[in-house]
Amino acid sequence: MTEYDMVVIGGGPVGLYATFYAGLRDMKALLIDAQDELGGQLVTLYPEKMVYDVGGFPGILAYELAQQLVEQAKMFSPDIRIKEWADMIERTQDNMWVVKTDKGNSFKTKTILIAAGIGKMTPSRLGAKGEVEYENKGVYYTVRRKKDFEGKRVLIVGGGDSAVDWALTLAPVAKSVTLIHRRDQFRAHERSVKQLYQVATVYTWHELKEVRGDGNRVTQAVIFDNRTKDEKILDVDAVIISIGFKGDLGNMPKWGVNMKGRDIIVNAKMETNLPGVYAAGDIASQEGAPKLALIAVGFGQAAIAVSVAKKYIDPNASLFAGHSSEMDKFKK
Protein backbone atom coordinates (compact mmCIF):
# COMPACT_ATOMS: atom_id res chain seq x y z
CA MET A 1 0.00 0.00 0.00
CA THR A 2 1.43 3.38 -1.04
CA GLU A 3 1.97 5.71 1.91
CA TYR A 4 1.37 9.44 1.69
CA ASP A 5 2.23 12.40 3.84
CA MET A 6 -1.17 13.90 3.11
CA VAL A 7 -4.41 12.86 1.46
CA VAL A 8 -6.47 15.85 0.32
CA ILE A 9 -10.18 15.12 0.07
CA GLY A 10 -11.90 17.46 -2.38
CA GLY A 11 -10.74 18.79 -5.73
CA GLY A 12 -12.20 22.29 -5.64
CA PRO A 13 -10.10 25.47 -5.49
CA VAL A 14 -9.07 24.94 -1.86
CA GLY A 15 -8.22 21.26 -2.32
CA LEU A 16 -6.22 22.05 -5.44
CA TYR A 17 -4.26 24.79 -3.71
CA ALA A 18 -3.67 22.55 -0.69
CA THR A 19 -2.29 19.88 -3.01
CA PHE A 20 0.10 22.40 -4.54
CA TYR A 21 1.16 23.68 -1.14
CA ALA A 22 1.77 20.16 0.15
CA GLY A 23 4.14 19.64 -2.77
CA LEU A 24 5.82 22.93 -2.01
CA ARG A 25 6.43 21.59 1.51
CA ASP A 26 7.97 18.40 0.03
CA MET A 27 5.02 16.28 1.14
CA LYS A 28 3.91 13.29 -0.91
CA ALA A 29 0.26 14.04 -1.61
CA LEU A 30 -2.81 12.29 -2.97
CA LEU A 31 -5.86 14.25 -4.11
CA ILE A 32 -9.22 12.45 -4.17
CA ASP A 33 -12.35 13.97 -5.71
CA ALA A 34 -15.77 12.47 -6.34
CA GLN A 35 -16.65 14.68 -9.30
CA ASP A 36 -15.96 13.91 -12.95
CA GLU A 37 -13.60 16.87 -13.26
CA LEU A 38 -11.36 18.83 -10.94
CA GLY A 39 -12.35 22.38 -10.07
CA GLY A 40 -15.32 22.01 -7.74
CA GLN A 41 -18.06 24.60 -8.01
CA LEU A 42 -16.00 26.58 -10.53
CA VAL A 43 -16.59 23.93 -13.19
CA THR A 44 -19.77 22.27 -11.92
CA LEU A 45 -21.93 25.29 -11.14
CA TYR A 46 -20.67 28.32 -13.05
CA PRO A 47 -17.79 27.59 -15.47
CA GLU A 48 -18.78 30.38 -17.88
CA LYS A 49 -19.25 33.06 -15.23
CA MET A 50 -16.66 35.65 -14.33
CA VAL A 51 -14.92 35.57 -10.96
CA TYR A 52 -13.77 38.92 -9.60
CA ASP A 53 -12.85 38.29 -5.96
CA VAL A 54 -9.63 36.28 -6.27
CA GLY A 55 -6.45 38.28 -5.73
CA GLY A 56 -4.38 38.93 -8.83
CA PHE A 57 -7.30 38.53 -11.24
CA PRO A 58 -9.37 41.65 -11.97
CA GLY A 59 -11.71 39.20 -13.69
CA ILE A 60 -11.34 35.62 -14.90
CA LEU A 61 -13.71 32.96 -16.21
CA ALA A 62 -14.40 30.38 -13.52
CA TYR A 63 -13.38 27.53 -15.82
CA GLU A 64 -10.09 29.23 -16.68
CA LEU A 65 -9.37 29.82 -13.00
CA ALA A 66 -10.02 26.14 -12.34
CA GLN A 67 -7.64 25.13 -15.13
CA GLN A 68 -4.88 27.30 -13.72
CA LEU A 69 -5.44 25.85 -10.25
CA VAL A 70 -5.24 22.32 -11.67
CA GLU A 71 -2.00 23.19 -13.46
CA GLN A 72 -0.58 24.61 -10.25
CA ALA A 73 -1.72 21.59 -8.21
CA LYS A 74 0.12 19.24 -10.58
CA MET A 75 3.38 21.16 -10.30
CA PHE A 76 4.93 18.67 -7.84
CA SER A 77 3.42 15.55 -9.42
CA PRO A 78 0.87 14.50 -6.79
CA ASP A 79 -1.27 11.42 -7.29
CA ILE A 80 -4.80 12.37 -8.35
CA ARG A 81 -7.94 10.26 -8.39
CA ILE A 82 -11.25 11.62 -9.69
CA LYS A 83 -14.67 9.97 -9.84
CA GLU A 84 -13.76 8.35 -6.54
CA TRP A 85 -15.44 8.99 -3.21
CA ALA A 86 -13.55 9.06 0.10
CA ASP A 87 -15.95 6.78 1.94
CA MET A 88 -14.36 6.12 5.34
CA ILE A 89 -11.22 6.89 7.35
CA GLU A 90 -9.68 4.59 9.96
CA ARG A 91 -6.89 5.09 12.47
CA THR A 92 -4.08 2.51 12.35
CA GLN A 93 -2.07 1.04 15.20
CA ASP A 94 1.01 2.96 14.06
CA ASN A 95 -0.85 6.29 14.39
CA MET A 96 -1.48 6.76 10.69
CA TRP A 97 -4.71 6.91 8.75
CA VAL A 98 -6.24 4.76 6.04
CA VAL A 99 -8.63 6.43 3.62
CA LYS A 100 -11.03 3.94 2.05
CA THR A 101 -12.92 4.80 -1.13
CA ASP A 102 -16.12 3.65 -2.79
CA LYS A 103 -13.97 1.90 -5.43
CA GLY A 104 -12.57 -0.46 -2.80
CA ASN A 105 -9.18 1.26 -2.68
CA SER A 106 -7.29 2.03 0.54
CA PHE A 107 -4.62 4.70 0.96
CA LYS A 108 -2.37 5.01 3.99
CA THR A 109 -1.42 8.52 5.04
CA LYS A 110 0.12 10.46 7.90
CA THR A 111 -2.37 13.33 7.62
CA ILE A 112 -5.69 14.16 5.99
CA LEU A 113 -6.97 17.52 4.80
CA ILE A 114 -10.71 17.69 4.18
CA ALA A 115 -11.57 20.36 1.61
CA ALA A 116 -14.81 18.84 0.40
CA GLY A 117 -16.86 22.04 0.20
CA ILE A 118 -20.55 21.13 0.13
CA GLY A 119 -19.73 17.55 -0.86
CA LYS A 120 -20.37 15.73 -4.10
CA MET A 121 -22.61 17.93 -6.22
CA THR A 122 -25.53 16.51 -8.15
CA PRO A 123 -28.15 18.57 -9.98
CA SER A 124 -31.69 18.83 -8.71
CA ARG A 125 -33.94 17.24 -11.32
CA LEU A 126 -37.56 18.02 -12.14
CA GLY A 127 -38.64 14.52 -13.07
CA ALA A 128 -40.24 15.73 -16.30
CA LYS A 129 -40.90 13.17 -19.00
CA GLY A 130 -37.89 12.84 -21.30
CA GLU A 131 -35.58 14.73 -18.93
CA VAL A 132 -33.30 11.80 -18.15
CA GLU A 133 -33.53 10.36 -21.67
CA TYR A 134 -32.15 13.56 -23.21
CA GLU A 135 -29.62 14.45 -20.53
CA ASN A 136 -26.49 15.72 -22.32
CA LYS A 137 -28.40 15.43 -25.61
CA GLY A 138 -29.98 18.82 -25.15
CA VAL A 139 -30.96 18.72 -21.48
CA TYR A 140 -28.39 20.38 -19.22
CA TYR A 141 -28.16 21.59 -15.64
CA THR A 142 -25.49 24.22 -16.14
CA VAL A 143 -23.67 25.97 -18.97
CA ARG A 144 -20.23 24.46 -19.42
CA ARG A 145 -19.32 26.36 -22.59
CA LYS A 146 -21.28 29.30 -23.91
CA LYS A 147 -20.30 28.56 -27.50
CA ASP A 148 -22.21 25.26 -27.35
CA PHE A 149 -25.43 27.28 -27.42
CA GLU A 150 -24.59 29.57 -30.34
CA GLY A 151 -27.51 29.88 -32.74
CA LYS A 152 -29.73 27.59 -30.66
CA ARG A 153 -33.24 27.98 -29.30
CA VAL A 154 -32.79 27.71 -25.56
CA LEU A 155 -35.35 27.09 -22.83
CA ILE A 156 -34.28 27.81 -19.26
CA VAL A 157 -36.22 26.54 -16.25
CA GLY A 158 -35.81 28.38 -12.94
CA GLY A 159 -36.23 31.69 -11.16
CA GLY A 160 -33.03 32.12 -9.18
CA ASP A 161 -29.84 34.02 -9.93
CA SER A 162 -28.29 31.15 -11.88
CA ALA A 163 -31.27 30.73 -14.20
CA VAL A 164 -31.57 34.45 -14.90
CA ASP A 165 -27.81 34.90 -15.26
CA TRP A 166 -27.66 32.07 -17.82
CA ALA A 167 -30.45 33.71 -19.78
CA LEU A 168 -28.58 37.01 -19.84
CA THR A 169 -25.32 35.27 -20.73
CA LEU A 170 -26.75 33.23 -23.60
CA ALA A 171 -29.07 35.86 -25.09
CA PRO A 172 -26.32 37.50 -27.20
CA VAL A 173 -25.25 34.19 -28.80
CA ALA A 174 -28.39 32.04 -28.87
CA LYS A 175 -31.03 32.25 -31.59
CA SER A 176 -33.63 32.73 -28.87
CA VAL A 177 -33.94 32.40 -25.10
CA THR A 178 -37.12 31.51 -23.26
CA LEU A 179 -37.31 31.30 -19.48
CA ILE A 180 -40.12 29.73 -17.46
CA HIS A 181 -40.68 30.04 -13.72
CA ARG A 182 -43.32 28.36 -11.62
CA ARG A 183 -44.14 31.60 -9.78
CA ASP A 184 -44.38 35.27 -10.70
CA GLN A 185 -41.76 36.35 -8.15
CA PHE A 186 -38.09 35.78 -8.88
CA ARG A 187 -35.36 35.04 -6.35
CA ALA A 188 -32.84 36.59 -8.72
CA HIS A 189 -31.50 40.11 -8.33
CA GLU A 190 -34.12 42.72 -9.26
CA ARG A 191 -31.86 44.45 -11.79
CA SER A 192 -31.12 41.15 -13.52
CA VAL A 193 -34.83 40.36 -13.77
CA LYS A 194 -35.48 43.71 -15.46
CA GLN A 195 -32.75 42.95 -17.98
CA LEU A 196 -34.19 39.47 -18.49
CA TYR A 197 -37.47 40.81 -19.84
CA GLN A 198 -35.54 42.84 -22.42
CA VAL A 199 -33.65 39.90 -23.93
CA ALA A 200 -35.81 36.80 -23.39
CA THR A 201 -39.36 35.52 -23.64
CA VAL A 202 -40.57 34.95 -20.08
CA TYR A 203 -43.45 32.76 -18.94
CA THR A 204 -44.26 32.99 -15.24
CA TRP A 205 -46.55 30.47 -13.54
CA HIS A 206 -45.24 27.90 -16.02
CA GLU A 207 -43.52 24.55 -15.52
CA LEU A 208 -41.85 21.95 -17.71
CA LYS A 209 -44.00 18.90 -18.47
CA GLU A 210 -42.05 17.06 -21.14
CA VAL A 211 -38.90 17.13 -23.24
CA ARG A 212 -39.24 15.70 -26.74
CA GLY A 213 -36.68 14.75 -29.34
CA ASP A 214 -35.72 12.42 -32.16
CA GLY A 215 -33.75 10.07 -29.92
CA ASN A 216 -30.45 11.87 -30.46
CA ARG A 217 -31.27 15.46 -29.64
CA VAL A 218 -33.94 17.69 -28.16
CA THR A 219 -36.44 19.19 -30.59
CA GLN A 220 -39.37 20.35 -28.43
CA ALA A 221 -40.45 21.12 -24.89
CA VAL A 222 -43.97 21.01 -23.49
CA ILE A 223 -44.69 23.60 -20.81
CA PHE A 224 -47.89 24.27 -18.92
CA ASP A 225 -49.55 27.02 -16.90
CA ASN A 226 -49.78 25.63 -13.37
CA ARG A 227 -52.94 27.66 -12.72
CA THR A 228 -54.99 26.83 -15.81
CA LYS A 229 -53.14 23.65 -16.92
CA ASP A 230 -53.03 25.06 -20.47
CA GLU A 231 -50.08 23.66 -22.42
CA LYS A 232 -47.67 25.16 -24.95
CA ILE A 233 -45.31 23.31 -27.27
CA LEU A 234 -42.02 25.12 -27.85
CA ASP A 235 -39.52 24.28 -30.58
CA VAL A 236 -36.18 24.21 -28.77
CA ASP A 237 -32.67 22.85 -29.21
CA ALA A 238 -31.64 22.94 -25.56
CA VAL A 239 -33.29 22.86 -22.16
CA ILE A 240 -31.32 24.15 -19.17
CA ILE A 241 -32.84 23.10 -15.85
CA SER A 242 -31.44 25.54 -13.31
CA ILE A 243 -33.12 24.74 -10.01
CA GLY A 244 -30.04 24.11 -7.91
CA PHE A 245 -27.55 21.44 -6.93
CA LYS A 246 -27.48 19.14 -3.93
CA GLY A 247 -24.35 18.54 -1.90
CA ASP A 248 -23.75 15.06 -0.50
CA LEU A 249 -21.12 14.47 2.18
CA GLY A 250 -21.62 10.71 2.10
CA ASN A 251 -20.35 8.93 5.22
CA MET A 252 -18.28 11.89 6.43
CA PRO A 253 -20.53 12.49 9.49
CA LYS A 254 -19.54 8.96 10.60
CA TRP A 255 -15.80 9.63 10.48
CA GLY A 256 -15.64 10.93 14.03
CA VAL A 257 -14.82 14.55 13.20
CA ASN A 258 -16.75 17.09 15.24
CA MET A 259 -19.37 18.68 13.02
CA LYS A 260 -22.00 21.37 13.39
CA GLY A 261 -24.59 20.78 10.75
CA ARG A 262 -22.62 20.32 7.54
CA ASP A 263 -19.52 22.13 8.85
CA ILE A 264 -16.41 20.57 10.36
CA ILE A 265 -15.28 22.35 13.52
CA VAL A 266 -11.63 23.46 13.47
CA ASN A 267 -9.36 25.58 15.64
CA ALA A 268 -7.09 28.41 14.53
CA LYS A 269 -4.61 25.85 13.15
CA MET A 270 -7.35 24.24 11.03
CA GLU A 271 -7.07 21.14 13.21
CA THR A 272 -10.13 18.97 13.82
CA ASN A 273 -10.64 16.92 16.97
CA LEU A 274 -8.85 13.99 15.28
CA PRO A 275 -5.02 13.93 15.34
CA GLY A 276 -3.52 14.65 11.96
CA VAL A 277 -6.87 15.52 10.37
CA TYR A 278 -7.51 19.07 9.14
CA ALA A 279 -10.25 20.92 7.30
CA ALA A 280 -10.25 24.04 5.12
CA GLY A 281 -12.53 25.97 2.82
CA ASP A 282 -16.32 26.09 2.83
CA ILE A 283 -16.62 22.95 4.95
CA ALA A 284 -14.48 24.34 7.79
CA SER A 285 -15.99 26.37 10.62
CA GLN A 286 -13.68 28.05 13.09
CA GLU A 287 -15.33 28.90 16.39
CA GLY A 288 -15.21 32.61 17.12
CA ALA A 289 -14.21 33.53 13.57
CA PRO A 290 -16.52 34.85 10.85
CA LYS A 291 -17.31 32.30 8.17
CA LEU A 292 -16.70 33.67 4.69
CA ALA A 293 -17.30 31.37 1.74
CA LEU A 294 -14.54 32.94 -0.34
CA ILE A 295 -11.88 31.20 -2.41
CA ALA A 296 -9.29 33.64 -1.08
CA VAL A 297 -10.09 32.70 2.52
CA GLY A 298 -9.85 29.01 1.66
CA PHE A 299 -6.39 29.48 0.14
CA GLY A 300 -5.08 30.90 3.41
CA GLN A 301 -6.72 28.13 5.42
CA ALA A 302 -5.17 25.51 3.15
CA ALA A 303 -1.69 26.98 3.60
CA ILE A 304 -2.14 27.01 7.38
CA ALA A 305 -3.44 23.42 7.45
CA VAL A 306 -0.61 22.09 5.29
CA SER A 307 2.03 23.96 7.29
CA VAL A 308 0.67 22.67 10.60
CA ALA A 309 0.48 19.16 9.12
CA LYS A 310 4.13 19.44 8.07
CA LYS A 311 5.15 20.11 11.66
CA TYR A 312 2.85 17.32 12.86
CA ILE A 313 4.79 14.91 10.65
CA ASP A 314 8.19 16.45 11.39
CA PRO A 315 8.33 18.52 14.60
CA ASN A 316 11.72 19.88 13.51
CA ALA A 317 10.31 21.35 10.31
CA SER A 318 9.76 25.08 10.03
CA LEU A 319 6.14 26.18 10.20
CA PHE A 320 6.76 28.78 7.49
CA ALA A 321 8.05 27.43 4.20
CA GLY A 322 9.61 30.71 3.18
CA HIS A 323 8.89 32.91 0.20
CA SER A 324 8.37 31.01 -3.04
CA SER A 325 10.33 33.65 -4.96
CA GLU A 326 13.42 32.57 -3.03
CA MET A 327 12.99 28.78 -3.34
CA ASP A 328 15.42 26.86 -5.53
CA LYS A 329 12.64 24.52 -6.71
CA PHE A 330 11.09 27.39 -8.66
CA LYS A 331 14.32 28.61 -10.20
CA LYS A 332 15.13 27.42 -13.70
UniProtKB/Swiss-Prot annotation:
A Pfam family that the UniProt record links to this protein: Pyr_redox_2
Chain residues that bind FAD: 33, 41, 46, 86, 121, 282, 325
Cofactor: how bound: Binds 1 FAD per subunit.
Keyword set includes NADP: yes
The entry's keywords: FAD, Flavoprotein, NADP, Oxidoreductase
A Gene Ontology molecular function term of the record: NADP binding
Transmembrane segments: none
Family: Belongs to the ferredoxin--NADP reductase type 2 family.
This protein's name: Ferredoxin--NADP reductase
Native species: Sulfurisphaera tokodaii (strain DSM 16993 / JCM 10545 / NBRC 100140 / 7)
